[in-house]
Structure formats: structure tokens, C-alpha cells
Amino acid sequence: ISRAQKNGEDSQKYSSKAIDYANLAMSTVIPYDSNELKGVWIRPTYYDKKSIEDVLDRLCDSGINNVFIETYYHGKTIFPSQTMEKYGFIKQYEDYAGFDPLRIWINEAHRRGIKVHIWFQTFYVGNKSPDTNPQYILAVHPEWANYQKKNADSDTIAYSVSEHNGYFIDPANPQVQNFLYELLSEIIERYQPDGINLDYIRYPQSLSPIYPNYDMSNWGYTSFARNEFKDMYGVDPIELKTTDPLWGYWKMYRSTKVTNFVRKAGMLCRAKNVMLTAVIFPNRASAMDTKLQDWKNWSANNFVDGFTPLFLTCDDKTAINLMEEVLRNKSASTKLYAGLFVTFMNGSNSDLIKQIHAARRYSLSGLIIFDYAHLNDTYVSTLTESVFRPIKKEYVIQESDIQKTNGTVQFKTKERARDRRK
């Protein structure tokens, strides 16, 4: 210690070793759970069978047992879709032309005992202007576009500045709901996936109610919604302010449109024995106020089988608070799968382990890593120490492993292998 205090390099070196040993110890004491869903979200940017097989082999070796394949995103499908073609939209992502990656993902995953969930961007259609391709969804159906109050009468289709300049379609429009329902039905009928994971199952994000321009930042001011609401309540919602008695009804009108789609998707999935999960924002008040996502209602009515909230933090205490928020507001029948963002945020191995430990302490039903592109070998190694696979090795530091050289304590690590779980 005295040497380390005098020598900065020694101090840094021994501190680093101490952290390494602490991380190793932490990863080996977290119990393995054979019943737990261990998943990862994947944007499938792989264009041949061998590449897909290599990814699945790597995941299988790391203990992953569920994959969430981004199948419908930015308003396009990775597979050749009859529904997309029927509506006059782009039949398939151009990069996959002549190739059906979804079929390969599902077949090869199942060969390895891995379940496949369809990651589905419900009301989000990407951030490319509709003007750039006549077959984009909002180029074919501009009347499906969602609008904020501040630009409700604009001739230009609105995008959400706070969400990567992305475009959204209108949950209130029955044509939108019918299209999305048909697309989900096609996927389920043709591919028999194990699950559907609804993402962007909400309105675009508005400001928080604490800001004076909250009402102007709200979304949902489409021609269809305004006319329907006026028929129901006798007032155009664009005339409402947050202090008006009917503001709560306008808020409920929009959140109910999202809930209705979740309900229909739940009925579809249940009839086909397909698991339905939804990506939610764990802070319930914020989810309702800024995204009109009434996930407590979905859970209370058993419209979904589980939630996959993203915990957008590397801090385990923040993640724990968010886990507790969801646990307080969901029903017992709705499973909770922790969506861990640590790898995407380039957090430390210990950050990842602490959040996994917290999820298991609260007896959550599983963990999902966001996302595969950021799941580097260091993280995989951490998971395979035991967190995602049964422990087969022990790392024991004994007195004989400690040697003293010139008054300096050093460790000689010994690996003692024995099967701890038969």
C-alpha cells in the first residue's frame, strides 16, 4: 500500500486488478436461472445464411435463449410482404431483395433451441422524408400522418424533432390500425414466431406538462381524430387547453386508440398461441402524459403477456427504481422482462452485472440486452462466466496464491474447475 501511495502507476495497476477481481467475483456469485428468458434485440443487417448462423451460434454459446428480430422497422419489412405489396408500399427492404432472412432466422434459431420474437415498430415509419420514395407509407397515404397541435394545419407532413426527426402514423385512423393488424396477421400465419414484441406502441413524445407549451407539443391532431372527437364531444380538440374540462377526455380518446390496437393484437396472438410483449416507458405518469401509453390498463385487462421496458441507464439504483415502478403498476399475470441498455451506453461490466443482479433479486421473468450490435466480446465473456450460463468454473484465491515480492502483495490466480450444477 505504501508503495502504491508513492507510485501512481502501481496504484492504478492494483486498483485495476482489484476491480477485475471484484467483477469476476460478482459474476460468479449471481445464481444461474434456467427458467429465465435471456434475450437480445437484433437489427438483422446480415444478408446470407452463413452470417445469420454465425450470429446464432455466438448467441447460443453465450446462453441467449430468445432473440428479438427487428422485422418491421422504418416502415419496411425484412421479408417479402404480401400485405405491404397489397397496400402499394415497398414490398421488402431493398437490401434483402431475393432473400428471406426472417425464414432463416426462425428456422436456424429453432434448430438451436432459441425462440424468436418479432420486433415490430408499430406507429413509427422512419425518418426519411416521404418525398424521397413514392412507395413510402406516407407517400402513398399522407392522410395517415400524425400531427402536433402547433402544426396541425400544415401542408407539410410533420416529423418528431425529439425522436430523430422520425415520422409517425395516426393510431386513431382505422385504416392505419387495419393495415398494421393485417401485417401482424401475415407474419404470424406465414412464419409462426414464438412472440410479437410491439415497439413504438404509443404517440410521438411531447413535452412534459411542467412546460408552458405542453399542449402545443401534443400529437394526434389529425383530420380524422379531430372530426371524430368533435362528433363525440362537440368541440374541435385543437381549441382545448390543458385547463379545459374536456382536456382529460381528449387525452383519454388518444390513449384509448393505442390501447385498442394492443387489445386486438393480444386477441390475435392468443388465438395463435403466440406470446405478446410490449416495449413500454417505465415511468407511468410520463408514459401517459408525454406518449399517451396507458400500459397499466393493458396489464389490468390482460391484453399482453409481458412488458419489455427499456431502462435507459447504466446506474443500477435508477434501474431498480424503474423496475419498482413497473412492478407497482402491473398485474401479477403480466411478466416483466428487464430491457438493459448498458451495452448500448458503453457501460462497464459491473454496471451490467449489477442490473442483472437487481432483476433477479426482484424475481423478474427475464432480461433482454439492447442490442446485439453493442454486445461485444467483453460483455459476452461477462455473461458466460455464469450469469447466462451454468457455472462450470470456480476462481479461488487461496493463501498459497498470494506471494510477496519486495514487500508487495501479488496474486497468483488459480482456476479450479468443477461442475457445480448437475
Spans of features found by a protein language model:
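The substrate-binding groove and active-site-proximal loops of carbohydrate-active enzymes
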Residues: 38-47, 84-98, 162-181, 244-258, ...
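Glycoside hydrolase catalytic-domain groove-lining segments
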Residues: 77, 211-347
